[in-house]
Amino acid sequence: MWNPSIRKFKNLVLPCLTCRIESKNLVHGIAYHSQNNDFKILRLVTYELWAKAEVYTLSTDSWREVVIELEPQTRFIDHIPESYCLFHNGALHTILNSAVERGYILSFDVNDERFRKIMLPQSYFDVAFYSDIHIKSLAVIKGSLAFIVFCNNIDRLSGKCHIWVMREYGVLESWTRKSVPMDLVQDFYGCTDNGELLIENATGLVSLDHESLNANKLAIEDAQWMAYTPNSMESLVLLDGLNVSSEYED
């Protein structure tokens, strides 16, 4: 765990769950637990048709396993396409694919430590059936949960971006959709506070206004090292504590 504000990091104790040969992918998410003024890390390990989860708590410096219980119960978890979780509205979110049902958003409430389903918009499945989906990801656009999909056109020289915004959190009927044409997108890194998309295209890393389609090329020459761009907030977390080190220590 690293706090860039004070340039200190903490080596975490080893997790309980191991990534065995049959494990398919690993997902992490970090969240602030407001009720206890604490931080938690969610770790999901997916296997062939199932998944396990564990939570690290900063105050106790320990991991413990949590059970994934969903209503209706999901028996077959096939794949989680992203390696990180999005923190929004007190919960961590990730897209989940199931072997026996349509994909959905898996949310983990940091306060009560319960998993819940948030269904993807119905119109997305129509897009998925008729389109070549290149990227699908979660983001926060102007305070609302958003589901963003980038599709390639047949010529693979251009594409389209579909954006669904959940106007009322957790309410399936509140998904609203907007589709805009755009040049081929190579990668997506999230959204800025004002709702612009951070994407990589043929010109490099750009910030794109999906309403006006105005693009601003960012002063980052090579985005290959980038994987995820969360919002930053200054904090004194890790100022004191066990196993905390400075960036400048040998």
Predicted stretch roles:
Residues M1-D250:
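Short, conserved recognition motifs on repeat-domain binding surfaces
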